[in-house]
Design a protein with these regions (language model features):
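RNase H-like DDE/DDD metal-dependent nuclease/strand-transfer catalytic core used by mobile genetic elements
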Residues: 1-93, 97
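C-terminal, beta-rich DNA-binding module of retroviral/retroelements integrases
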Residues: 99-207
Length: 207
C-alpha cells in the first residue's frame, strides 16, 4: 500500500497523532466492509490512533481541512504548471508560504509553524495483540474468515492477517473483538457474523 509507506514516513518524522479525522471514502473507509473499516483504518487502530469519521455529506465537519484544500488548489493548480517538476515547485512554495510566512486570522495572526509541536508518541511499529479476557485468539485468514472447529466464519477481508479475540457468550454464540472493539457475534450454525453497534460510526463533531 503506497499510502502506508507515506504515512510511515510522516509518523517517523512527526510522531503518532492521537486521532485522525476523515470522510467516509477510500482509503479511509470501505463502504462494503464490516463497520466500514479499511485496511488503512485497521493499521491506524493497530498503532493506537483513533479513527474519527465525519457524517456522510457533511464536509463542514472537517471544515479546516476542506478549506486548506481549496486554498491549495487555488494557489497551485489554477492554472497548473507545465510539467511535474514545475508543479512540485509550486507545491513546495505553497508549503513554505502557508506554514512559515503567511499569518492566519484563526490563530491570532501567527503562522502554523510558530504553534506546531510534534507528537510525543513515537512510532515503533505494530504492538503485539493479546486477548487475555477472551476464550481464544485466532488469526483472520487473508480471505477474511475465522476457522473454528472445522467451520469457516466470514468476517472481513480488511482484517486479513489480524489477530482477534473470540469469547463464547451463549450456546454456539461467540463474540468477536478486535483490540478493545467488539465487532459482533456469530453462531456456529450460520457461520456468519452479525455486526454489533458500530464503534467507528460517524458522530456529531465539532471543529
Amino acid at each position: 500500500m503506497l499510502f502506508r509507506s507515506v504515512f510511515e514516513h510522516l509518523f517517523r518524522e512527526y510522531g503518532l497523532p492521537k486521532r485522525i479525522r476523515s470522510d467516509n471514502g477510500i482509503p479511509f473507509a470501505s463502504a462494503h466492509a464490516l463497520h466500514g473499516l479499511s485496511r488503512l483504518a485497521v493499521w491506524w487502530l493497530r498503532l493506537g490512533i483513533e479513527i474519527e469519521r465525519i457524517k456522510p455529506g457533511n464536509p463542514q465537519q472537517n471544515g479546516r481541512h476542506e478549506r486548506m484544500h481549496r486554498v491549495l488548489k487555488q494557489a497551485t493548480a489554477r492554472p497548473p504548471a507545465g510539467n511535474m517538476l514545475q508543479q512540485q515547485d509550486k507545491f513546495e512554495s505553497f508549503i513554505q508560504e502557508y506554514n512559515y510566512e503567511r499569518p492566519h486570522e484563526g490563530i491570532q495572526m501567527k503562522t502554523p509553524a510558530a504553534l506546531y509541536e510534534p507528537s510525543k508518541r513515537i512510532y515503533k511499529g505494530l504492538p503485539e495483540l493479546q486477548y487475555p479476557f477472551h476464550d481464544r485468539t485466532v488469526v483472520i485468514t487473508e480471505c477474511g474468515r475465522i476457522c473454528l472447529d472445522r467451520r469457516k466464519i466470514s468476517v472481513s477481508t480488511v482484517l486479513g492477517g489480524q489477530k482477534v479475540g473470540i469469547k463464547q457468550v451463549d450456546d454456539q454464540i461467540w463474540q468477536v473483538s478486535f483490540m478493545q472493539y467488539d465487532l459482533g457475534y456469530f453462531d456456529m450454525d450460520s457461520c456468519r457474523i452479525e455486526p454489533g453497534p458500530n464503534p467507528f460510526g460517524p458522530r456529531l463533531l465539532t471543529m
